[in-house]
């Protein structure tokens, strides 16, 4: 795991929602994320450590209210944790580099993987493939 900034540094540099989601395993309200409707070509990175997580070509509209992807950039980019909270059985996804909470993965996505990586915008930074512009979720 990468060296992660201290909680004080993160609180100073992140919005309340970004801190809540990435550090406290929170979930942003559905249909509110800044990157939900982003359709530009580029790469979605971890907001905390900037590790690449998802290519825009794997993003799709699942209708669930959070950015959805069917595949990460690599197996190493995501860490999978069994999550039994809230009376449900789910698989939590975290950044494979810094362990920031991203969201959950579900087995109801499109082909070719059949998986839906349901990710909080607040855990992501998008880098535009054409002009390099960065947008924090």
Curated annotation (Swiss-Prot):
This is Peptide methionine sulfoxide reductase MsrB. Changing residue 46 to D: Loss of activity. GO terms for biological process: protein repair; response to cadmium ion; response to oxidative stress. Keywords: Metal-binding, Oxidoreductase, Zinc. Zn(2+) binds at residues 46, 49, 95, 98. Its cofactor is Zn(2+). The lineage of its organism: Bacteria, Pseudomonadati, Pseudomonadota, Gammaproteobacteria, Enterobacterales. It comes from the Bacteria. Binds 1 zinc ion per subunit. The zinc ion is important for the structural integrity of the protein. It catalyses: L-methionyl-[protein] + [thioredoxin]-disulfide + H2O = L-methionyl-(R)-S-oxide-[protein] + [thioredoxin]-dithiol. One of its GO terms (molecular function) is zinc ion binding. Pfam families: SelR. Residues 7-129 form the MsrB domain. Coiled coil: none annotated. One of its GO terms (cellular component) is cytoplasm. Its EC number is 1.8.4.12. The active site is at 118 (nucleophile). Belongs to the MsrB Met sulfoxide reductase family. PANTHER family: METHIONINE SULFOXIDE REDUCTASE, METHIONINE-R-SULFOXIDE REDUCTASE B1.
């Amino acid at each position: 795991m990468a060296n992660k900034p201290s909680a004080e540094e993160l609180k100073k540099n992140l919005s309340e929602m970004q801190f809540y989601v990435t550090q406290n395993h929170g979930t942003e309200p559905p249909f509110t994320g800044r990157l939900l409707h982003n359709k530009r070509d580029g790469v979605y990175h971890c907001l905390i450590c900037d590790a690449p997580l998802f290519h825009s070509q794997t993003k799709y509209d699942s209708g669930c209210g959070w950015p959805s992807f069917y595949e990460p950039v690599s197996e190493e980019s995501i860490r999978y944790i069994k999550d039994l909270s809230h009376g449900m059985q789910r698989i939590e996804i975290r950044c494979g580099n810094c362990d920031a909470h991203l969201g959950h993965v579900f087995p109801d996505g499109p082909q070719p993987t059949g998986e839906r990586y349901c990710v909080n915008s607040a855990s992501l930074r998008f880098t535009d493939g054409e002009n390099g512009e960065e947008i924090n979720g």
